[in-house]
């Protein structure tokens, strides 16, 4: 084996190790797992998610324009409807005999304690008209 091939093999091994260690921190949930003591569940999770999305939106350049605030109320109603739809889907998935992927907002923030970055992954993308 030549020196460059050996170096490439070592570099590839280090890269794989780094990828594995960074992806190893994902939350996973077993069916029937109990909530984390610092986790947020149910209406508390929905309210926390909504608040964190508003914070993220303002950090990304949201404004306090009154016209946009009126539009925000309907966006919040849509978010609440979306969360209700997700809850209904989660209940259907719990009844399913097939195992589901153990990652989602409930897994990350109720069954585990989530970070700001983790909960804002579930926020809708910020567009120019949503600030």
From Swiss-Prot:
UniProt tissue specificity: Expressed by the venom gland.
Endpoints of the signal sequence: 1-24
4-carboxyglutamate modification, residue list: 118
Cellular component annotations (GO), alphabetically ordered: extracellular region
Disulfide bonds: 29-107, 41-110, 53-123, 109-114
SMART domains: IlGF
Residue ranges listed under propeptide: 59-92
Protein purpose: This venom insulin facilitates prey capture by rapidly inducing hypoglycemic shock. Intraperitoneal injection of this peptide into zebrafish lowers blood glucose with the same potency than human insulin. In vivo, when applied to water, this peptide reduces overall locomotor activity of zebrafish larvae, observed as a significant decrease in the percentage of time spent swimming and movement frequency.
Quaternary organization: Heterodimer of A and B chains; disulfide-linked.
Name assigned to this protein: Con-Ins Q1b
């Amino acid at each position: 084996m030549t020196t460059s091939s050996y170096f490439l093999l070592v570099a590839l091994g280090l890269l794989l190790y780094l990828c594995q260690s960074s992806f190893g921190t994902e939350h996973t949930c077993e069916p029937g797992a109990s909530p984390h003591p610092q986790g947020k569940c149910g209406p508390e999770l929905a309210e926390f998610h909504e608040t964190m999305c508003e914070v993220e939106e303002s950090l990304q350049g949201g404004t306090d324009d009154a016209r946009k605030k009126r539009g925000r109320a309907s966006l919040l109603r849509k978010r609440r409807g979306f969360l209700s739809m997700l809850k209904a889907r989660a209940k259907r998935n719990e009844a399913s005999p097939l195992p589901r992927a153990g990652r989602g907002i409930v897994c990350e923030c109720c069954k585990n304690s989530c970070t700001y970055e983790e909960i804002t992954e579930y926020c809708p993308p910020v567009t120019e008209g949503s600030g």
